């Protein structure tokens, strides 16, 4: 649930309540594209030192590597990342544009050739939600 705490002109301050914690807005989100921050920052550092409120992960990249089957076997994304705070996952839609040379758009969704190993990947709305 989102609560608007203060507004002045076009600026707003609020908070999201999630089952994994509260996110104060505006917020800076670290991007852990494939469930990890580049540069050797650990989940403990993010929580304790950097006071990170939420982690952003990319659905397409998680699906390609490490793979949603591995994340599932590990007990879900929170356990895989050793992260107990909120996680925001995108739909993978940005890759429709950024990987334009590796994709084909159809009525039912998008077919990609993996940028890692070339394997064929399909992502429609249902697949995106399932991965997330």
Language model regions located:
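Non-catalytic, usually N-terminal nucleic-acid engagement modules in DNA/RNA processing proteins
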Residues: 1-131
